[in-house]
């Protein structure tokens, strides 16, 4: 396959480079990623500033470019200027940290994959659980991403769907399997620590904790129970459950 590889952690991040090195052994890979860390960029794009593109050398067989913009910018620029017309799949990751539950609304990783789907290119976001003070093992996540590609044939890929793949932090032997599941509820309870600088300005620093609803059948539940999760996503945010009900409110 011809693969466009991007992320939100930046072009030098361990996750994307681990994945690029493995995928490039079996597929034609072009890496286009932010020059710096752009986590939680969501689906923002650059409008009022020029985007700077730099070619980057990598020690394995990929063509690589850094972009001064956001993760979504990377996909837009790549598909318009940097990659061949016959890209088979956009892959975003491997992200440092899960993108499950409400995380997906903030995620630059997921949004880059969604941007690919908006261009009618099948896309997948790949994220690995991060545990503070423990060393990440991106090789396990890369192996699952490659395995997912090997199970998918080109004719199986829907061009407007994003596959959201998340891998728990544990040994490969501890992983219980793969669960296709829906998005769960994982909310960051935001609090800001307030300080005052020398000029008397308020300085707000983000802190808080995570509130998870552990309902069986969701990505949050299965990650907690050491399953790899796969969730199909779509960029159409219409709430079809109340579409007709809402219409009736304005007809009455």
UniProtKB/Swiss-Prot annotation:
Entry-linked InterPro entries: SurE (IPR030048), SurE-like_Pase/nucleotidase (IPR002828), SurE-like_sf (IPR036523)
Cofactor note as given: Binds 1 divalent metal cation per subunit.
Keyword check for Nucleotide-binding: yes
Keyword DNA damage attributed: no
Location(s) in or outside the cell: Cytoplasm
Transmembrane segments: none
GO molecular function terms attached to this record: 3'-nucleotidase activity; 5'-nucleotidase activity; exopolyphosphatase activity; metal ion binding; nucleotide binding
EC number of this enzyme: 3.1.3.5
UniProt record similarity statement: Belongs to the SurE nucleotidase family.
Name used for this protein in its record: 5'-nucleotidase SurE
Species in which this protein is naturally found: Clostridium botulinum (strain Loch Maree / Type A3)
Source lineage: Bacteria, Bacillati, Bacillota, Clostridia, Eubacteriales
Protein's gene: surE
